């Protein structure tokens, strides 16, 4: 792996690994090696959820559990993590197998999001909880400053359903049109058909649920509700 690219990534992250092998593992997809990043991803997912929950708890002392849960879900969901990954140009640093490289895996939202979680797990093992917590808060500063409780934090499928019901329109239909990849690393493509839109809207994700949420989010944007 190009050391110039790796050093540039660490500068963008705001953290230099003491044990570079942890960084290498965090950037390695299971298609590239048996020493891949899925265990780090598991760890990072839990750490991220805790750090964001703790930040929201202290930022919003009068907000109830439901609104805090929805805000946390917005901040830790796959497309938010993928946005962060793109801000760090993470795609150019990924270690992917030939099949994933050929299919453009370095652009795939689910792979970018999973790698961000693996990096969080790697930083924790390389340092301590205080260091990784401060790093996450630095990454999320703008998003934490901008987020607020309310209906906008409901997931896209719920918001779309409520919008249509409020106008006495039929509920959206979701159809799986493609499933790519091996069982452990699939990508679902969903078509969402909504009354008033001439063509179905496409969403993709690492599970059917995530793909449906992505499609609903695109519908909301077309309806100018996002």
Curated annotation (Swiss-Prot):
SUPFAM superfamilies: dsRNA-binding domain-like, RNase III domain-like. GO terms for molecular function: double-stranded RNA binding; metal ion binding; ribonuclease III activity; rRNA binding. The active site is at 45, 117. Its cofactor is Mg(2+). The keyword Electron transport does not apply. Mg(2+) binds at residues 41, 114, 117. It catalyses: Endonucleolytic cleavage to 5'-phosphomonoester. It comes from Salmonella choleraesuis (strain SC-B67). Residues 155-225 form the DRBM domain. The keyword Secreted does not apply. Belongs to the ribonuclease III family. Homodimer. Keywords: Cytoplasm, Endonuclease, Hydrolase, Magnesium, Metal-binding, mRNA processing, Nuclease, RNA-binding, rRNA processing, rRNA-binding, tRNA processing. This is Ribonuclease 3. Pfam families: dsrm, Ribonucleas_3_3. Residues 6-128 form the RNase III domain.
């Amino acid at each position: 792996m190009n050391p110039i690219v790796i050093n540039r990534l660490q500068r963008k992250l705001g953290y230099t690994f003491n044990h570079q092998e942890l960084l290498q593992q965090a950037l390695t997809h299971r298609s590239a090696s048996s020493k891949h990043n899925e265990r780090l991803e598991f760890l990072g997912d839990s750490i991220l959820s805790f750090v964001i929950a703790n930040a929201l708890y202290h930022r919003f002392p009068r907000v109830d559990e439901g609104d805090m849960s929805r805000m946390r879900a917005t901040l830790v969901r796959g497309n938010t993590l993928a946005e962060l990954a793109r801000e760090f140009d993470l795609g150019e640093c990924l270690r992917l197998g030939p099949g994933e490289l050929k299919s453009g895996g370095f652009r795939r939202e689910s792979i970018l999001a999973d790698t961000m979680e693996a990096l969080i797990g790697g930083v924790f093992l390389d340092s301590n909880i205080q260091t990784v917590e401060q790093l996450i808060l630095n990454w999320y500063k703008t998003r934490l400053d901008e987020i607020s409780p309310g209906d906008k934090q409901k997931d896209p499928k719920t918001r779309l359903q409520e919008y249509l019901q409020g106008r006495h329109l039929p509920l959206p239909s979701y159809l799986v049109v493609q499933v790519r990849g091996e069982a452990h690393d699939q990508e679902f493509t969903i078509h969402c058909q909504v009354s008033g839109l001439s063509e179905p809207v496409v969403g993709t994700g690492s599970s059917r649920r995530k793909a449906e949420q992505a499609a609903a989010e695109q519908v909301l944007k077309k309806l100018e509700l996002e």
